[in-house]
UniProtKB/Swiss-Prot annotation:
Broadest EC class assigned to this enzyme: hydrolase
Gene: scrFIR
Example of a GO biological process term: DNA restriction-modification system
Other remarks in the entry: The ScrFI restriction system has two different methylases.
Keyword set, alphabetical order: Endonuclease, Hydrolase, Nuclease, Restriction system
Record bears the keyword Nuclease: yes
Protein name: Type II restriction enzyme ScrFI
EC number: 3.1.21.4
Organism listed in the record: Lactococcus lactis subsp. cremoris (Streptococcus cremoris)
Gene Ontology MF term list: type II site-specific deoxyribonuclease activity
Amino acid sequence: MNPNKERLIEIFRSNVKGRIPDISGRNIRHDGRWGHWLEERFGISANADNHADILGYELKNEATSGKTTFGDWSANEYIFKTPPYNSLFSGSTASEKQNAFCRMFGKPNEAKNGRFSWSGSPIPKIWQYNSFGQIMVIEENLDIVIYYSFSQDLRYNKFEIIPPQLQHDEIQIARWYGVANPLLSRRGKTLKDKLEDKFNDLGWFTCTTDSIGAYDKICFGRPITFENWINLVDSGIVYFDSGMYEGNKRPYSQWRADNSYWNSLITDCHQ
């Protein structure tokens, strides 16, 4: 066993095992509160550099939602930010144009006073058009792209929502660079860099809980390569779970897989 894994097992046994997280007073959604508590027990601070959390391993919290996140990875290009169509979105700032994008390609939430979001049903699955005229594809260069096609848009009021310049097919609305950034340093890292910086060092680990919510085991999984990951996107096992909504400048671009898949990657557990 490598010494880094041994050290993580030691930390788990001394700081985590047998404990039920005290998440009172934490102003974060439920799974996030548990995740932050666990990070603190392992001595992990806020990690903005997109590298593995600790000792070459990425920590993944056992989410009660039934799905676990690879990362919050926004697209490198959005239609409301980049030419030739960005001028069609009202607003003088990026966040205002993002709001306009949500109104054009998203849906209103009546429970939120009609606030529009690009999340849920407007977000396409891989290789399938949805009723909002959107489809996600993987291109030959391994970029992931969401296209909009007016002919596939089933909304009754699409002529009112979509400007004439966008009333045709296969319009790119979001693009993630797969393995190469054609603009070099501009518009961020590729998906390959983001994934492998976190998951292709020594691997990843998670901590599981027993029936009363106390942590009982630490489990490890092998490193994950971009080649494996993009194949999982292709098959629909990994999916894009957007949380973009009107009034919030953060795009919330989560890439996830169900917990059952993560569990299948576990190679060894320790109590």
